[in-house]
């Protein structure tokens, strides 16, 4: 469900640090370089069947952009950008093609949802990937310390059920962390200081938008 209050911006995760609040307490924050984003297209109910704004972010060599995508940027009157996403909104009247969005779309104390790609861990076992306890370290255990154990009976069920937690590739998943507080907006430097941790590595792309479950707090 869309909401007229929903705002959003693309940015880059710079890393974590700590700051002090007005009560002199330490607050762990993640620093996000937010924008600048540019509006490249506006979707409307009449023409597209839904309301949304298309945001573009990040520099890219124009020679690396194919012709159809280059044409879309040319139509919007902006230079090509590396990342393009759509933000669903109920009211597009606040946006216009070519408009630039910065960190100032949010205010101090706003609640946001942050989406990013988690760090890739490669092939991982069940203890790391799913938190399995493993087996005994002694008392007769031999070369089974980190094994998962049984994955199904021989005759019944005679197969491995779908969804069985096993070893495999871990990380590099799209993850959204909800209801994080914007501790401070540094408009001069285009930074968002978000309380707590957010998904992804340093330098990774993140999408910051108004909290879906934030209610009046957002």
UniProtKB/Swiss-Prot annotation:
- The reply to whether RNA-binding figures as a keyword in the UniProt entry is yes
- PROSITE patterns, alphabetically? RIBOSOMAL_L3 (PS00474)
Q: Which GO terms describe its biological process?
A: translation
Q: Membrane spanning segments where?
A: none
Q: Which Pfam families match?
A: Ribosomal_L3
The organism sits in which domain of life? Bacteria
- Relate the assembly described in the record: Part of the 50S ribosomal subunit. Forms a cluster with proteins L14 and L19.
Q: Name one GO molecular function term.
A: structural constituent of ribosome
SUPFAM superfamilies in the cross-refs? Translation proteins
Q: Which gene encodes it?
A: rplC
Q: Which Gene Ontology CC terms are recorded?
A: cytosolic large ribosomal subunit
Q: Which family does it belong to?
A: Belongs to the universal ribosomal protein uL3 family.
Give the organism, scientific name: Rhodococcus opacus (strain B4)
Asked if the record carries the keyword Translocase, the reply is: no
Keywords for this protein: Ribonucleoprotein, Ribosomal protein, RNA-binding, rRNA-binding
Q: What is this protein called?
A: Large ribosomal subunit protein uL3
Q: What does this protein do, in the record's words?
A: One of the primary rRNA binding proteins, it binds directly near the 3'-end of the 23S rRNA, where it nucleates assembly of the 50S subunit.
- Which InterPro entries does this chain map to? Ribosomal_uL3, Ribosomal_uL3_bac/org-type, Ribosomal_uL3_CS, Transl_B-barrel_sf
């Amino acid at each position: 469900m869309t909401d007229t209050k929903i705002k959003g911006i693309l940015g880059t995760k710079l890393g974590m640090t700590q700051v002090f609040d007005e009560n002199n307490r330490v607050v762990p924050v993640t620093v996000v370089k937010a924008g600048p984003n540019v509006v490249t297209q506006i979707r409307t109910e009449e023409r597209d069947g839904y309301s949304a704004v298309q945001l573009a972010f990040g520099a890219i060599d124009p020679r690396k952009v194919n012709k159809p995508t280059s044409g879309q940027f040319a139509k919007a009157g902006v230079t090509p950008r590396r990342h393009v996403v759509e933000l669903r909104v109920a009211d597009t009247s606040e946006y216009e093609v070519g408009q630039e969005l910065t960190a100032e779309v949010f205010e101090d104390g706003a609640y946001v949802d942050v989406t990013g790609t988690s760090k890739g861990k490669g092939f991982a076992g069940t203890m790391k990937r799913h938190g399995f306890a493993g087996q005994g370290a002694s008392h007769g255990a031999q070369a089974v310390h980190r094994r998962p154990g049984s994955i199904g009976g021989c005759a019944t069920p005679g197969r491995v059920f779908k969804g069985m937690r096993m070893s495999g590739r871990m990380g590099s998943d799209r993850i959204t962390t909800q209801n994080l507080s914007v501790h401070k907006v540094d408009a001069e430097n285009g930074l968002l200081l978000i309380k707590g941790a957010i998904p992804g590595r340093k330098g990774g792309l993140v999408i910051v938008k108004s909290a879906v479950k934030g209610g009046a707090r957002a």
